[in-house]
């Protein structure tokens, strides 16, 4: 854990080795494979030590995206010092300033710890503290891109103000769409983001 809000996890798959980067940074939260090396602090942070304890010899059983939200869950299975199977979810929430990385015990549903501890003084609806039950971020009421049809798309983005600001309308209307992704979608659709009603939208 080279900084307070980012992690590197080494993954072994047969003879292959992968390095997974996780970030809960406000400006560049994300998850991706990398070959980047980084200098680590002399004394590992507490969250890093906890992950080493629970994940160092664990097997990855599943990696999934929650619905079409920007939430990724890495489900693991390990054996503790008593020989019992222990299952965890490493949850990466990619949500701008609300981004977080949490380790949750699957059986109890409780948070073992997280990279950003949020108390009730900061967020009354949702606290992320060790020992509390994990509560998923509230739904934003957006339409899933898995459920999109041309009719639903036109209705959703029109209601979200596509004519005034296409990029913001896509982000507001469709779950899992970031501002960068919205800009790329518009560019690929029309070759430009300047036309507020692209040919693809009118069609």
Task: Label each PLM-derived region with a short phrase.
Residues 14-203:
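Phosphate/anion-contacting hairpin/loop surfaces
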Residues 1-19:
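N-terminal-proximal low-complexity accessory segments that begin disordered
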